[in-house]
Amino acid sequence: MRFVVAVSALALLCAGVQAAAQSRVRLNWGAISGVMSPIWVAQEEGLFKKYNLDLELIHIAATSKAIQSMLSGEIQFTTADALNTIQAFNAGADVVMICEGVNRFVFSIMARPEIKRIADLKAKKIGITRLGSSTHTAVLYVVNKAGLGANDYTLLQLGEVPNILTTLLAGQIDAGALSPPTNSRAKKAGLQELINLGTDGPEYPSTVIASTRSYVKSNPENTRRMVRALGEGLAIFKSNRQIGIRAIQKYARLNDAEILEDTYKQFRDAFDPIPYVSRAGIASLLAGMGEKDSKIRQIRYEDVADMRFVAEAEKEGVFKKLASK
């Protein structure tokens, strides 16, 4: 009887130690887009558990709201646009980018069939998710390059990327910025692709993983685990088509095989194998933002990006090993 009690007590103690090793964190994914695929794959393949993170996934669509939730301690990590992160830092917020999501605008500017060129968007209505979002920045890049001014078009904020397509198909707007899989659905519906920024656009950190410097400082091990789990999710997504498509299918709620395949290919090609936030992309972004706000000209890459956990994993050969699997 004493032996049974002792064994039971030991089992409970071991369970307690194991539970203690699992660190509870919350990660927000912000968009119904294939750009979230490394997160989705990491969750579905049990990678957060593998790296001893007791993870809760949260979905907050607006980056500004997600950053507010992070600053209040409700969540520890979030996907974000680099522009929003820099703006928050410039306003005094304790935010920092810890790894890349994607260093490209993986968006297509889709329009009604009769619109053939970006210049044709003059006096037209263009859909974005929110002001200050990646969709907004993508549209501004395209229309500015085409020589259109702020008074030449109207922007409508529609909340989520799928809402832009719905509104476009209903004829209530003339064009919009759509990410995969929504741009694939738009092409299949007969809409006109004016430009694919994933292949023809600039280097731009449209999605990053952010945290707070105070959290990273007090929880370096959790941050290390997060970067490695996401890095492995990224590697699996790029190398395993079946797992990648299955994750997109579940979280984007898609069943169309053609659209799933197109979405997978677009992001497989867009994701970098090692998730550094692009220095060139941040430099370009800071230069552009600095034209309107001189304070931003003083910000350095290291002020807003802490890549030590990515660098550490690269030095240890983690990404090379994952890529060779």
Q: What kind of feature is each model-predicted range?
A:
Residues L83, P162-R253:
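Pocket-lining segment of extracytoplasmic ligand-binding domains
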Residues V5-A15:
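Bacterial N-terminal signal peptides
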Residues A21-A170, D174-P180, E193-E203:
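Short, glycine-/small- and polar/acidic-enriched structural segments
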Residues K217-Q298:
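Secondary-structure end/capping motifs
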Residues S133-G149, Y153, A229-I259, E302-E312, ...:
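Ligand-binding clefts/hinges and TM-proximal coupling segments of bilobed small-molecule sensing domains
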Residues A287-K325:
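Conserved C-terminal helix/tail region of periplasmic/extracytoplasmic solute-binding proteins
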Residues C14-Q22:
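Bacterial Sec-dependent signal peptides at the C-terminal "C-region" and cleavage site
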